[in-house]
């Protein structure tokens, strides 16, 4: 501990001097320790650590979608920003811009915390009114929809508090009495590559054909980062809710950064997988749309019996034969099957296109305790 304290003292000395001395009496078995170190040697030993301090700066600019030239002031935060080499690296990174040293680096974090506290308390003080301090979601939040797709409701870096609501058709199978809501965080296209936060079931749903727009899901993050997910059966008003605190099941800073890096490196293949599953879901949805339309009273006299039989045969073939044996088909193959179905008996003219089956089972958006997730019944 004495050696660590002496090294810390030398580091601070080198921020204002070009050389520092370390003296420790009886460091080990009665042997005194004495040495000196220059600022140049110190900077050489710590060069990799100093360079790594620019990584969060670059990340903050990327996340905010800002260029270095758009930054007005560069404020130093934290005692280590007193190190001359760190200041030089930062100044060079911003093309020689002068650093703002008007705030004590040790007190800068406290200033920010005080402003955040005032904002959360609704302080009307003039000093706070002109300040904008935003917190953001570290990863995208969403749920699993048909085909294991990650359907995002709250995007990464969305400012919080925030609330998003989306309607889902494709969560239900034919006459299914309940639906499982699985909540994930992550940037990958498929939920298997993301982090499961929790799951809950919305049960006792009245029997209904597959695809009827029934389930409304709301993601709500408050100022403390607590996530509430509510699923509501729109036909009955019955709802179920799950609440996740910011420290239960959530990823660490290092894991978040790893997931962001992985998402960037797998972006192309993730998009291809998302498109493939979307095409598969669109085909399945169109089949059920056509089968349902064939039984509508208003269309019975418009479709010749021969054409009706062809369509019914195709509707039986696609989900029970072709899809069963082609689970890993490419996007183009699913689209080809859908075009064939549309062409038989001019389905697109007689029945009209399916308006809800092309988005992996989702429409466009409309608008805890220490033991873990809490599931709450809401009548």
UniProtKB/Swiss-Prot annotation:
GO MF terms held by the record: ATP binding; ATP hydrolysis activity; ATP-dependent protein folding chaperone; heat shock protein binding; protein folding chaperone
Keywords: ATP-binding, Nucleotide-binding, Stress response
GO cellular component, as recorded: cytoplasm; cytosol; nucleus; plasma membrane
Family annotation (Pfam families): HSP70
Family annotation (PROSITE patterns): HSP70_3 (PS01036)
Entry's Gene Ontology BP terms: chaperone cofactor-dependent protein refolding; protein refolding
Similarity section: Belongs to the heat shock protein 70 family.
The name this protein goes by in its record: Heat shock 70 kDa protein
């Amino acid at each position: 501990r004495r050696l660590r304290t002496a090294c810390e003292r030398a580091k601070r000395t080198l921020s204002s001097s070009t050389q520092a001395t370390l003296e420790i009496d009886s460091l080990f078995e009665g042997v005194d320790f004495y040495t000196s170190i220059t600022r140049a040697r110190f900077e050489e030993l710590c060069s990799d650590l100093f360079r790594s301090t620019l990584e969060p700066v670059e990340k903050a600019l990327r996340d905010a979608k800002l260029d270095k030239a758009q930054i007005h002031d560069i404020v130093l935060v934290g005692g280590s920003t007193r190190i001359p080499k760190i200041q030089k690296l930062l100044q060079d990174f911003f093309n020689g811009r002068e650093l703002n040293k008007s705030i004590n680096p040790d007190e800068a974090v406290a200033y920010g915390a005080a402003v955040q506290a005032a904002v959360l308390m609704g302080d009307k003080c003039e000093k706070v009114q002109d300040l904008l301090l935003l917190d953001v979601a570290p990863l995208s939040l969403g749920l699993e929809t048909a085909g294991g797709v990650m359907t995002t409701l709250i995007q990464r870096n969305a400012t919080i508090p925030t609330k998003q609501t989306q309607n889902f058709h494709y969560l239900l199978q034919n006459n299914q009495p309940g639906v499982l809501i699985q909540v994930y965080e992550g940037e990958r296209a498929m939920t298997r590559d993301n982090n499961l936060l929790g799951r809950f079931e919305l049960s006792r749903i009245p029997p209904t054909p597959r695809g009827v727009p029934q389930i409304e899901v709301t993601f709500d993050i408050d100022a403390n980062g607590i996530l509430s997910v509510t699923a509501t059966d729109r036909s009955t008003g019955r709802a179920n809710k799950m609440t996740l605190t910011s420290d239960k099941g959530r990823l660490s800073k290092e894991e978040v950064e790893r997931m962001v890096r992985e998402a960037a490196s797998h972006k192309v293949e993730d998009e291809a997988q998302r498109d493939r599953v979307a095409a598969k879901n669109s085909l399945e949805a169109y089949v059920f749309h056509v089968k349902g339309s064939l039984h509508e009273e208003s269309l019975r006299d418009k479709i010749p019996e021969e054409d009706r039989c062809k369509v019914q045969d195709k509707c039986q073939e696609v989900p029970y034969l072709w899809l069963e044996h082609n689970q890993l088909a490419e996007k183009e193959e699913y689209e080809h099957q859908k075009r064939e179905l549309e062409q038989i008996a001019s389905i697109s003219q007689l029945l009209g296109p399916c308006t809800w089956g092309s988005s992996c089972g989702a429409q466009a958006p409309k608008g805890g305790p220490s033991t873990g997730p809490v599931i709450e019944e809401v009548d």
